[in-house]
Amino acid sequence: MSTSERGKRDTATHPVDEVLPPARLTVLGLQHLFIMYAGAIAVPFVVGGALKLSAATIALLVNADLLVAGIATLIQAVGVGKLFGVRLPVVAGATFTVIPPMITIAAKFGGEKGLPYVYGAMLCSGVFGLLIAKPFAKVIRFFPPLVAGIVITVIGLSLIGPAAAMIAGHDTEDPHYGQVSHIMVAFAVVFGILLLARTLRGFLGQIAPLLAIIAGSVLALFTHSWSGGARTGSWDLSGVGHADWLGFAAPFHFGAPRFDAAAIISLCIVMLVTYTESTADMIAVAEMTGKELSSADITRGLAADGLSALLGGSMNSFPDTLFAENVGLVQMTGVRSRWVTAVTGGLLVVMGVVPKVGAFVAAVPEFVVGGAALVMFATVTAVGIQTLKKTEFHGNHNLLIVATSLGLSLLPAYASDRFGNSVFFEKFPDWAQIVFGSPITIAVVAAFTLNLVFNHLGGGVGSPALPVVPAVPAVPAIAVVSARPAPGSGAASAPALQRSPAASPLP
């Protein structure tokens, strides 16, 4: 190999860092936005409804939520020096883990009057998160393909239920639950993605989910569904007319932050759970994109989560985590450029300060997006299974580790009430419900612990523990992208990456 060829190979831009043409960046960024929007605004709606806040106050929370999510996404995708941002194609949004403690804290101090205590605790949890980001990131040393595969698989499986709720409805006792028209449109979106994946090439193949959502939205116009609003019924653009052009609330809108020890402890536990989920998502994206992930990368990504809690506490919002919905989209489309999700972050910021834009996106029927979400969540599961294939299952206890971890982690997902909320640990203390109510957290704890016990302590043999995620080419789980991606698509095969010197197995 000539010196010039070797130089070109060494200086080649990794697909994660590739800057695509502006038009493609915009469309691909919009696709990520459509996928995550329903989840992004769910937290303020649920919290606002539980606390019986006024419509105007809930709208303020939604705007603040989108603004902070946009800032957090920009920080994660673009990065801020050596301090913040994992620099991967990820999207941040409000974590669902914060809902129970946030409602409990606010209700304890008088509903809306208790929000200053919520935001005071959130500020403290953000500081706590920044302090523990570096030591927490060291756990990546104990995430071999065995553990990573289990966690990624659980991420996907635990999201199938929410996808079903998006399609059929969120209350099984509602007379409108499971409408045939909604389910058929969602299936049409799934079929559309498969059809477009089979027939389209290049850029059009990469935006197959977005094209299917658009087609499904048009189809929804002709369904005879009940007029129940954009989130559960068919198209309803009335919210666009009522939305303001500008809607930016001043920091500490609900008053100066106040501090309560129990509230602070609760949200610090939420931060630990958030870090667990974000770490799993970062590992999954690194696996999909072929980008080597070091503990320093994880530290910056977690620090960005901690910073989002500080921003949320001061700007009337919520702590953010990385959205698994968008992790699945990265794998499904094969587009690995982090600048795509940077555009998504910019769009979220715009929606946070221009409510009319957000209201229009919110008008897309939820069952339409649910069809696309179903494929993407299942894709995450497929990536986890693909990762587990790298594990040796003969002459060790790895199969038992996988079986036990999957069984334990899915218990909360399969034991739920009429609204889909897990009730398996409802008799446990509040802190235990927060920690163990997340299948992802249980998966991480179980797989991590069992791997150490069976494969490392006492001379166990099995799966080697690696300090970084192995850099492998990202092969789409479903053929949305052609085997010959279009130039500048960001879907080129990842170059071979050298493992860092620190990447040695545990003794």
Protein language model features and the residues they cover:
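Short, non-helical or kinked segments that cap or interrupt transmembrane helices
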Residues: L60, L83-T97, R141-A148, G205-L211, ...
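Hydrophobic, membrane-embedded alpha-helices of multi-pass small-molecule transporters
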Residues: A23-A40, G178-V190, A208, F248-D281, ...
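Terminal cytosolic tails of multi-pass membrane transporters
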Residues: P439-P507
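Membrane-embedded alpha-helical modules
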Residues: A107-W226, T344-G345, V349-S463
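N-terminal signal-anchor module of multipass membrane proteins
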Residues: S2-P89, P100-F109
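Hydrophobic transmembrane alpha-helices of multi-pass solute/ion transporters
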Residues: D10-T11, P15-V19, L195, L210-L267, ...
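Juxtamembrane interface elements at the cytosolic ends of transmembrane helices
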Residues: R6-D10, A40-P44, G48, A188-T199, ...
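Membrane-embedded helical hairpins/re-entrant loop segments and their flanking transmembrane helices
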Residues: P22, G48-R87, S266-R338, A483
